[in-house]
């Protein structure tokens, strides 16, 4: 099933405009859709008690690029209690470019929002001053409207840049307004800047490529072992499917 034919392209899914912007912009750069195994590309399920069963939908969509992108994938979830857009671009390691990471999660009582150029090397080896200044300026503008969430632990923070947007909002009308307006604007600014940098980058030497491979693997292995979405996914789809999804699709190239 094409993701364009699912609920995730409809206005009643919270993140539909974000997903459309992603897919449209990646197509402009001649990215090619990557076939996802059918058991992960679309799934309907139910969760909750026998008396209060609720429906949940999941779709996984991915693309590659012949030179620039190893794998870019979106995981979308829709249910009465949860609405999720998780997106990751894994760039080709012949370019010294960070990951592009999005994790927008609507829980029963709150929204958790993360947007970043996530490093695969130490900050000083992957970000020049001009890029850091641009990111921090965009971040500060976003956080003039969206509150900054609590400080991340050192173990988690090492996988984020100084430009990370990290917010926690209550489930209320004001938050809906902030998501639809400020967050969407910041999301477009970050994605536009990322794709511009990725597609203008020059190839790096073999020594640095090896460092990039190791850095990417460290992050992907960490996420496979410590994915914070694991409990939510297990409660919605069961442990076996969740472990398979994490291992086979979410954090692999």
From Swiss-Prot:
<dbReference type="GO" id="GO:0050897">
    <property type="term" value="F:cobalt ion binding"/>
</dbReference>
<comment type="function">
    <text>Catalyzes the two-electron reduction of the C2 and C3(1) diene system of 15,16-dihydrobiliverdin.</text>
</comment>
<protein>
    <recommendedName>
        <fullName>Phycoerythrobilin:ferredoxin oxidoreductase</fullName>
        <ecNumber>1.3.7.3</ecNumber>
    </recommendedName>
</protein>
<keyword id="KW-0560">Oxidoreductase</keyword>
<dbReference type="GO" id="GO:0010024">
    <property type="term" value="P:phytochromobilin biosynthetic process"/>
</dbReference>
<dbReference type="GO" id="GO:0050618">
    <property type="term" value="F:phycoerythrobilin:ferredoxin oxidoreductase activity"/>
</dbReference>
<comment type="similarity">
    <text>Belongs to the HY2 family.</text>
</comment>
<dbReference type="Pfam" id="PF05996">
    <property type="entry name" value="Fe_bilin_red"/>
</dbReference>
<dbReference type="InterPro" id="IPR022827">
    <property type="entry name" value="Phycoerythrobilin_Fdx_Rdtase"/>
</dbReference>
<dbReference type="InterPro" id="IPR009249">
    <property type="entry name" value="Ferredoxin-dep_bilin_Rdtase"/>
</dbReference>
């Amino acid at each position: 099933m094409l993701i364009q034919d699912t609920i995730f392209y409809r206005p009643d899914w919270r993140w539909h405009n974000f997903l459309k912007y992603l897919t449209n912009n990646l197509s402009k750069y001649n990215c090619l859709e990557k076939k996802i195994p059918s058991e992960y590309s679309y799934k309907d399920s139910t969760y909750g008690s026998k008396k209060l069963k609720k429906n949940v939908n999941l779709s996984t969509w991915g693309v590659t690029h012949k030179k620039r992108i190893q794998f870019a994938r979106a995981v979308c979830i829709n249910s009465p209690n949860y609405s999720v857009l998780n997106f990751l671009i894994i760039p080709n390691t012949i370019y010294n470019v960070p990951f592009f990471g999005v994790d927008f999660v609507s829980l029963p009582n709150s929204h958790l929002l993360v947007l970043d150029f996530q490093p695969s090397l130490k900050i000083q080896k992957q970000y020049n001053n001009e890029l850091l200044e641009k990111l921090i300026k965009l971040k500060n503008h976003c956080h003039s409207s969206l509150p900054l969430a609590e400080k991340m632990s050192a173990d988690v923070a090492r996988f984020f840049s100084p430009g990370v947007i990290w917010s926690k909002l209550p489930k209320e009308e004001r938050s809906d307004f902030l998501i639809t307006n400020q967050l969407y604007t910041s999301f477009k600014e970050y994605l536009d800047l990322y794709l511009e940098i990725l597609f203008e980058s020059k190839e790096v030497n073999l020594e640095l490529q090896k460092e990039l491979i190791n850095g990417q693997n460290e992050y992907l292995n960490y996420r496979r072992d410590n994915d914070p979405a694991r409990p939510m996914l297990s409660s919605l789809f069961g442990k076996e499917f969740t472990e398979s999804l994490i291992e086979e699709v979410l954090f692999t190239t």
